[in-house]
């Protein structure tokens, strides 16, 4: 039985950083890299010295998830690590976002993540790990990013409760909640009229991933990198959410 790691959103951004650093935290025979863009996956495979198996799949489609499910049933690998890094957001007034994009966020950010967790768990043993990527937006409601923020709140809640359930089997679940991070995420998220005008700070994905792997090894439940991100996490616990939303709208000069 071969030991594998599975990672979605593997072709760029944090997903790529997580993939390239897998050997520093865990030993596996093969890495299953899942992303939409086949050319980027192939380039990643050629550039790295890792044993990568690529899958060009659109996780919005149920058929893509079924392909993974069928492959797991066929090969029955030992999954040492699952990283759900695929996801996207749209920053715009809700009524200006297409229904397709709004539902798409829920499908990729929540439904695909949940499906992959539930499909992978039967092939996991003691000391296996799941890393799910959420966001600091998970800590409070965020106008003009509301579907995205809500989808990440789901990831945080689902992951923390799943981690408690799986702790008896020795399977650890970590939720990573990044602040603004320098990735291609914004190429798709930001509308032409740029509703979000001010980014307090942009963190490097390398630092976010490094902190996440350290927190995984320490068996923490939530990983938040950076002073500002941690401050936001604390303030969102202490302050009324209506007040937090007002601060956000004032910062972005939104009504």
Residue ranges with predicted function:
Residues 11-12:
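Conserved glycine-rich cofactor-binding loop
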């Amino acid at each position: 039985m071969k030991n594998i790691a599975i990672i979605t959103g593997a072709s760029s951004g944090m997903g790529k950083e997580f993939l390239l650093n897998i050997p520093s935290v865990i030993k596996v025979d093969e890495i299953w890299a899942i992303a939409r863009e086949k050319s980027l996956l192939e380039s990643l495979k050629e550039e790295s010295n890792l044993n990568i198996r690529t899958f060009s799949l659109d996780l919005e489609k149920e058929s893509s998830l079924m392909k993974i499910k069928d492959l797991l049933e066929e090969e029955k690998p030992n999954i040492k690590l699952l990283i759900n890094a695929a996801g996207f957001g749209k920053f715009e007034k809700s009524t200006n976002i297409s229904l397709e994009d709004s539902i798409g966020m829920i499908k990729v950010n929540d439904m695909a993540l949940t499906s992959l967790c539930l499909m992978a768990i039967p092939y996991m043993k003691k000391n296996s790990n799941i890393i799910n990527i959420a966001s600091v937006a998970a800590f409070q409601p965020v106008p003009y990013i509301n579907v995205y923020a809500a989808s990440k709140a789901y990831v945080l809640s689902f992951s923390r409760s799943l981690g408690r359930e799986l702790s008896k089997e020795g399977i650890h679940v970590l939720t990573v909640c990044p602040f603004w991070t320098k990735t291609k995420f914004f190429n798709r998220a930001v509308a032409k009229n740029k509703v979000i005008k001010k980014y307090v700070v942009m963190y490097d994905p390398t630092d976010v991933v490094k902190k996440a792997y350290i927190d995984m090894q320490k068996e923490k439940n939530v990983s938040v990198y950076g002073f500002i991100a941690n401050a936001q996490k604390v303030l969102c616990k202490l302050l009324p959410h209506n007040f937090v939303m007002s601060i956000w709208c004032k910062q972005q000069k939104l009504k």
